Amino acid sequence: VVSTSLLVSVDRMGDVAEDKSSFYSNAEDYWREVPPTVDGMLGGYGSISSIDISGSKAFLRKFLGDGEGKTGKGRALDCGAGIGRISKRLLLPLFRTVDLVDVTQEFLDKARTFLGDDAKRVGNYYCCGLQEFIPEPDRYDIIWIQWVIGHLTDDHLVAFLRRCQKALRPAGLIVIKDNVSYEGVVPDDVDSSVCRDLDIVRRLVGRAGLRVVHEEQQLNFPKEIYQVHTLALR
């Protein structure tokens, strides 16, 4: 989730691509051991949750409402949802229905109670890695992808974004919010992920046939973690 790796930046995606199965299985093993709590979802940085949600809400509200190019408020998809922290505080207050997808069944089981009364507005809980997940076409107004793209290889990220584009309703929006490295690709062997720089993320977005329509840096996060940027894609 929140990458605190301070390793020297190197381009390692080539190595990862050669051993996809262990890249994914090691990540699944890591998350299986993480407690199903907000602090667990945020790598021990539970204290930043409110700042994160406030920033995301301000970002998202620029696109919601009536009028040309505005996004509907029908259904959202929370990718890498964990226990539903983002669904509970960001998506369910703004959308009628939310679907959750995560690779760890224990987190999705916890989400059913963590979401409280709002759980009745959850459409589906999908237990699946994003590299294999196929969202239903023409279903979502917002697809929210936060702190999870580092768990996908370049090719799988591009393919997933293409599937997400097909899953959008008219005027729908894909949002990526994630850590970005200062240069290149930085591997994190602890949770079996990578952190890419912004230029690489933008290039992969372009390969998926999408364009960045708005971009912001999340402010007021601890200085020791990588910068976090939010990108709206169409």
Q: What function would you assign to each model-found segment?
A:
Residues 2-4:
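Extreme N-terminal basic, low-complexity initiation segments
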Residues 144:
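A conserved beta-strand element that flanks and buttresses the S-adenosyl-L-methionine
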Residues 6-136, 152-163, 172-234:
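Class I (Rossmann-like) S-adenosyl-L-methionine-dependent methyltransferase catalytic domain
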Residues 169:
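Short, conserved loop/helix-junction motifs that constitute active-site signature segments
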Residues 148:
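Hydrophobic adenine-recognition pocket in adenosine-nucleotide-binding enzymes
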